[in-house]
Amino acid sequence: MESQQLHQNPHSQHGSAYASVTSKEVPSNQDPLAVSASNLPEFDRDSTKVNSQEETTPGTSAVPENHHHVSPQPASVPPPQNGQYQQHGMMTPNKAMASNWAHYQQPSMMTCSHYQTSPAYYQPDPHYPLPQYIPPLSTSSPDPIDSQDQHSEVPQAKTKVRNNVLPPHTLTSEENFSTWVKFYIRFLKNSNLGDIIPNDQGEIKRQMTYEEHAYIYNTFQAFAPFHLLPTWVKQILEINYSDILTVLCKSVSKMQTNNQELKDWIALANLEYNGSTSADTFEITVSTIIQRLKENNINVSDRLACQLILKGLSGDFKYLRNQYRTKTNMKLSQLFAEIQLIYDENKIMNLNKPSQYKQHSEYKNVSRTSPNTTNTKVTTRNYHRTNSSKPRAAKAHNIATSSKFSRVNSDHINESTVSSQYLSDDNELSLRPATERI
């Protein structure tokens, strides 16, 4: 009889289960399974509703109302300590200053429906149940900075976040992530959060607060859909769902790598060599550029490298262009060997040039001072040298020599006069002297 009654009333099971959670006692003389939900008194149904609401566990108010199923609640788990947050750390609430954008730390302010199905982000809707393995941000966790140095002071933000900052555009594809992250970093800098963004070396100026962490996390997930992120970004977030700083740090590093690739291509295309530096230095410079490009999955063939090098050769190395013009199989090592050979030959010639010049100069000096020289050009120049060009000492010497010569001539004339007079006296001849002394 009872089985037939249950079969006829399919809702009787639900009614009995619904009544079992109430605080209303069922009379012991009546089988509770035999009483259908429709036969309960009106006050019993009201008390059942009230008591079922009172016995609801704390925390289920955030879950959408469901009378037939109660969602499991997430366990209280401290924030993840893996990833880069062991190094960077976050400030405790007593260190964090009162933020003017505190409402941005509420996930409900950044509602985005397509993130509700992604396991790598904690859900932006506070009414959505969180998975057990994704803990939310908690301000009661121990600060790793306090465990190291309790008296250390961390710089805090002193400016307010601007309210009229232009938000970044939404990421549209995985290939555009490198471009999108530039706009996102600019967005954070315009929001006065540039001092917590890692630089090229992965260093930051100060530690971020919990409010700033939530602000960065929520804005990142709002404008970057998870299914459009690159694989390396997904791998980071799967290890630590909130480690946005590591993503930004590696993004900056990749941007620097891309800039370095461009610089290397420009340097390789503008190579110049004229022998002013050693051939070894030139070879090391070119090889370093080619190796750096190879590490970034950019292979430079020997033929292309030889063509770029030959284009920049000048001076004594220029003739190598004609030598390699007809070659089809160019080897970079062979080209470097020939450049080294020319450089060594020029170096030997430059070392011999000063000694040859010195010997030639000494030969010229000897020919000028030798008395037996046959250089008519030197003799003519010295013979016609005027007294006006002589130095003052030479002029005085010439004057003294000329006066001495005149005195010698006058003495000779006097002696001849006396001898002539003596001859005339002996021969008794009267002769007229040739000269008279004045």
Swiss-Prot record:
What gene codes for this chain? TY2A-DR2
- Summarize the subunit comment: Homotrimer.
User: Per the UniProt entry, what is one GO biological process?
Assistant: viral translational frameshifting
Feature: compositional bias, Low complexity: 369-381
Sorted alphabetically, which InterPro entries does this protein's record hold? Answer: TYA
Asked whether the UniProt record includes Cytoplasm among its keywords, one would answer: yes
Q: Which lineage ranks, top first, belong to the organism behind this chain? A: Eukaryota, Fungi, Dikarya, Ascomycota, Saccharomycotina
Please indicate which residues carry the site annotation Cleavage. H397, N398
Could you identify this protein by its name?
Transposon Ty2-DR2 Gag polyprotein
Polar residues biased stretches: 1-39, 49-60, 399-408, 415-424
